[in-house]
Amino acid sequence: CCQWPCSHGCIPCCY
């Protein structure tokens, strides 16, 4: 998954 929490306009984490 992606970074969570998001920072610098990244996409939210997948569920």
Swiss-Prot record:
Disulfide bonds join C1-C14, C2-C10, C6-C13. The modification Tyrosine amide is found at Y15. Keywords: Amidation, Disulfide bond, Neurotoxin, Secreted, Toxin. Its main location: secreted. It comes from the Eukaryota. Expressed by the venom duct. The keyword RNA-binding does not apply. It is found in: Secreted. One of its GO terms (cellular component) is extracellular region. The cysteine framework is III (CC-C-C-CC). Does not show any effect on voltage-gated sodium and potassium channels (10 uM of toxin tested), and on nicotinic acetylcholine receptors (5 uM of toxin tested). Does not show antibacterial activity on both Gram-negative and Gram-positive bacteria. Intraperitoneal injection into fish provokes paralysis. Negative results: does not show effect on Nav1.1, Nav1.2, Nav1.3, Nav1.4, Nav1.5, Nav1.6, Nav1.8. Does not show effect on Kv1.1, Kv1.2, Kv1.3, Kv1.4, Kv1.5, and Kv1.6. Does not show effect on muscular (alpha-1-beta-1-delta-epsilon) and neuronal alpha-7, alpha-4-beta-4, and alpha-3-beta-4 nAChRs. This is Conotoxin Asi3a. It comes from Conus asiaticus.
